[in-house]
Regions:
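Loop-centered beta-sheet repeat module
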Residues: 150-158, 163-174, 185-192
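C-terminal accessory/tail domains of diverse enzymes
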Residues: 1, 148, 159-171, 198-278
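Active-site-proximal structural scaffolding
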Residues: 66, 107, 153-156, 183, ...
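Active-site neighborhood of thiol-dependent amide/isopeptide-bond enzymes
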Residues: 143-155, 178-179
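Core alpha/beta catalytic barrel or barrel-like domain that forms the active/cofactor pocket
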Residues: 68-77, 83-101, 121-141, 171-191, ...
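A generic structural motif
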Residues: 42-48, 102-103, 143-149, 194-198, ...
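ATP/Mg2+-dependent ligation/transfer catalytic cores
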Residues: 1-130, 149-155
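Acidic/histidine-rich catalytic neighborhood
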Residues: 184-204
Length: 278
C-alpha cells in the first residue's frame, strides 16, 4: 500500500488529504532498467474505495466476458492547436484512413513506438491503424475479464502519454476536438462477447441481446464519456445519441453485428459503437 496527497489531485480536502494506492496489476516497464508499471486502485484513508475508483465496482468473478477496445485519439500539435499534419486547405477526410505516405500519415513513429512498448510490457495490443481524420490514430486491446481489460487500456494510455512527451505532442481524447466540422470524432468502440454470444448460433438470441440495450440507452450514455453528444450526431459513422439501433455491418448503428459473426453461424461478438474516446 502507498499513499499520496489527494488534495493536489482534487480527490481529497487539504485537512484530510491522504489517499491510498492499492496495487492490482504489475507490468514490466520496457523503457526503464529494472522498472515496473503498477496499476493501482485509489482508496480513502480508511481503506474504502474512493468515489473515483470505478474499478472497485466491477463484479469480475470470472473471465466469461471478453473485451476488445478500439482506442481512437488525435496526435495534437500544441503549436498550431490542431491535429498533427492537419491540412491548411481543409482537404476533405478520406485519404487518411489506414494510409501511408507523407501527405497522408502523420505521427507513425509515435504510434509504432507505442505499439512496441505495449507489447514489451505484456499488454495485448491486437492492432493499430491510422484513422479517418488527419493526425488521428487507433490501437486495439483484447483481454478476458473486465478488470484486466480496463487495466491494460489504462496502462496503454499512460505509455502513450509518456511517449508523446518526447515529441512535445498532446494526446487528445476529446470525442469531437474539431467541433461541428465535417471531420470524424474519436470513440472507443467496445467489442464484447460471452459464452452465449460465442456459441449460440442463433440470430434470434443476438437480436434479443441487442434489444435488451434499448430500455437502458440513457444509463449507457451516462457512463460512455463526456461531450459524447458532440460526436453521436448520426453523421460520421455514428447513430444519434437520442436513438438506438443495431444491424449487421452497420457502422451507423448504436451496436454493430460484425459480418464475421454472421458468417460464423451467429457465433462471435457484438460491437457497441457509442462509447467515447475519453
Amino acid at each position: 500500500m502507498w499513499s499520496f496527497d489527494g488534495s493536489s489531485t482534487l480527490q481529497a480536502p487539504g485537512g484530510s488529504s491522504d489517499c491510498l494506492l492499492k496495487p492490482v496489476a504489475i507490468y514490466p516497464d520496457p523503457e526503464r532498467k529494472n522498472g515496473f508499471l503498477v496499476m493501482t486502485e485509489v482508496l480513502n484513508a480508511d481503506g474504502t474505495a474512493h468515489e473515483s475508483n470505478g474499478r472497485s465496482t466491477i463484479d469480475d468473478s470470472d473471465n466469461d466476458f471478453w473485451f476488445g477496445f478500439e482506442q481512437e485519439y488525435f496526435l495534437w500539435d500544441t503549436e498550431t492547436n490542431l491535429p498533427l499534419g492537419f491540412p491548411k486547405d481543409q482537404t476533405p477526410q478520406g485519404q487518411f484512413y489506414c494510409s501511408v505516405g507523407g501527405a497522408n500519415t502523420f505521427g507513425r513513429e509515435i504510434m509504432d513506438r507505442h505499439l512496441d512498448v505495449c507489447l514489451d510490457a505484456g499488454i495485448n495490443v491486437e492492432g493499430t491503424n491510422a484513422e479517418v481524420a488527419a493526425g488521428q490514430w487507433e490501437f486495439q486491446t483484447f483481454a478476458k475479464g473486465a478488470q484486466q481489460a480496463g487495466d491494460e487500456m489504462w496502462v496503454a494510455r499512460y505509455l502513450l502519454e509518456r511517449i508523446a512527451e518526447d515529441y512535445a505532442i498532446k494526446i487528445e481524447y476529446h470525442p469531437k476536438p474539431l467541433g461541428a466540422t465535417d471531420w470524424n470524432g474519436s470513440g472507443m468502440h467496445a467489442n464484447f462477447s460471452n459464452t452465449t454470444l460465442r456459441t449460440c448460433g442463433s440470430k434470434e438470441t443476438y437480436e434479443k441481446i441487442c434489444e435488451a440495450f434499448r430500455p437502458v440507452v440513457d444509463e449507457c450514455i451516462a457512463v460512455y464519456g463526456a461531450y459524447n453528444d458532440q460526436r453521436l450526431t448520426g453523421d460520421h459513422e455514428t447513430q444519434s445519441i437520442t436513438e438506438f439501433s443495431y444491424g449487421v455491418s452497420d457502422r451507423g448503428a448504436s451496436i454493430r453485428i460484425p459480418i464475421m459473426t454472421v458468417e460464423s453461424g451467429w457465433k462471435g461478438w457484438l460491437e457497441d459503437r457509442r462509447p467515447a474516446s475519453n
